[in-house]
Regions:
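Short, low-complexity N-terminal intrinsically disordered segments enriched in polar/charged residues
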Residues: 1-35, 51-52
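Surface-exposed, charged secondary-structure patches
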Residues: 2, 9, 38-41, 52-97
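Hydrophobic alpha-helical segments typical of transmembrane helices
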Residues: 13, 25, 57-58, 73, ...
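Short secondary-structure boundary/capping segments
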Residues: 29, 76-78, 105
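Short beta-strand segments enriched in hydrophobic/aromatic residues
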Residues: 33, 91-93, 119-120
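Short glycine-enriched, charge-decorated loop/helix-capping segments at active-site entrances
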Residues: 44-47
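Short beta-strand edge/turn micro-motifs at domain boundaries
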Residues: 88, 99-123
Length: 123
């Protein structure tokens, strides 16, 4: 019987996601996303229907994190079900890059978890 809590699942998920982000590995980042998925940025929503869309999105965003070598994810679970975890995550970066706060809906995909919806929040 799987006894991992949703908090543990989210922590492990975001530890892996953080490594992919810091490595600037668009392919590894994309593997953390479900297909279909929704990246809901203001004035630039992306309805993801192919893994390559997520890879392209993040490849184009790496420049805004120039100089960042460490980041910390503070995770707060705001809702959970057997198939979804909603996590309010504040990212604190080094190198003077502003903090970010995002709401992630993680969904179960077989034995793994993936991001189905990503929405920015006010910090």
């Amino acid at each position: 019987m799987d006894t991992m809590t949703n908090s543990t699942i989210a922590q492990q998920f975001f530890d892996s996601y953080t490594r992919a982000l810091l490595d600037r590995d668009a392919k590894a980042i994309a593997e953390h996303y479900a297909v279909p998925a929704l990246i809901e940025f203001p004035d630039h929503p992306i309805a993801v229907s192919e893994v390559s869309q997520t890879e392209q999105f993040f490849s184009g965003a790496f420049g805004q994190y120039d100089g960042v070598s460490t980041t910390h994810a503070t995770i707060r679970i705001v809702a959970e079900t057997g198939h979804s975890i909603w996590a309010d995550v504040t990212w604190t970066h080094d190198a003077g890059v502003p903090s970010e706060r995002l709401l992630y809906q993680l969904v179960r995909s077989g034995s793994d978890w993936r991001i189905a919806v990503l929405t920015p929040l006010d910090t």
